[in-house]
Amino acid sequence: MGFNNLVSLAVLIEKVFPIRYTPAGIPVLDIILKHESWQEENGQQCLVQLEIPARILGRQAEEWQYRQGVYVHVEGFLAQKSRRSLMPMLRIQNIQEYKG
């Protein structure tokens, strides 16, 4: 069964945690993203505000480790936060500074 799991958001990098490395030497950067926008739902305007944990792997992790407070556009997919937690975490595959 092949369901789509694609997320695209304009967000603020609210918090950046210290970079870490897997045993294989792959950089891992965990961040908290903050989003706020007005969306239409059932014909009414609805204010959407959320924070979501996210993870960047590889070279991009090293590039973004000092970018707290920057607005970005991210694309990725939702996955479980850990083996023990089914809470969602955005796994970022593409990240670019948001130019508005």
UniProtKB/Swiss-Prot annotation:
<comment type="subunit">
    <text>Homodimer. Interacts with PriA and DnaT. Component of the replication restart primosome. Primosome assembly occurs via a 'hand-off' mechanism. PriA binds to replication forks, subsequently PriB then DnaT bind; DnaT then displaces ssDNA to generate the helicase loading substrate.</text>
</comment>
<dbReference type="GO" id="GO:0006269">
    <property type="term" value="P:DNA replication, synthesis of primer"/>
</dbReference>
<dbReference type="InterPro" id="IPR012340">
    <property type="entry name" value="NA-bd_OB-fold"/>
</dbReference>
<protein>
    <recommendedName>
        <fullName>Replication restart protein PriB</fullName>
    </recommendedName>
</protein>
<comment type="similarity">
    <text>Belongs to the PriB family.</text>
</comment>
<keyword id="KW-0238">DNA-binding</keyword>
<dbReference type="InterPro" id="IPR000424">
    <property type="entry name" value="Primosome_PriB/ssb"/>
</dbReference>
<comment type="function">
    <text>Involved in the restart of stalled replication forks, which reloads the replicative helicase on sites other than the origin of replication; the PriA-PriB pathway is the major replication restart pathway. During primosome assembly it facilitates complex formation between PriA and DnaT on DNA; stabilizes PriA on DNA. Stimulates the DNA unwinding activity of PriA helicase.</text>
</comment>
<keyword id="KW-0639">Primosome</keyword>
<feature type="domain" description="SSB">
    <location>
        <begin position="1"/>
        <end position="99"/>
    </location>
</feature>
<dbReference type="InterPro" id="IPR023646">
    <property type="entry name" value="Prisomal_replication_PriB"/>
</dbReference>
<dbReference type="GO" id="GO:0003697">
    <property type="term" value="F:single-stranded DNA binding"/>
</dbReference>
<dbReference type="GO" id="GO:1990077">
    <property type="term" value="C:primosome complex"/>
</dbReference>
<dbReference type="Pfam" id="PF22657">
    <property type="entry name" value="SSB_1"/>
</dbReference>
<keyword id="KW-0235">DNA replication</keyword>
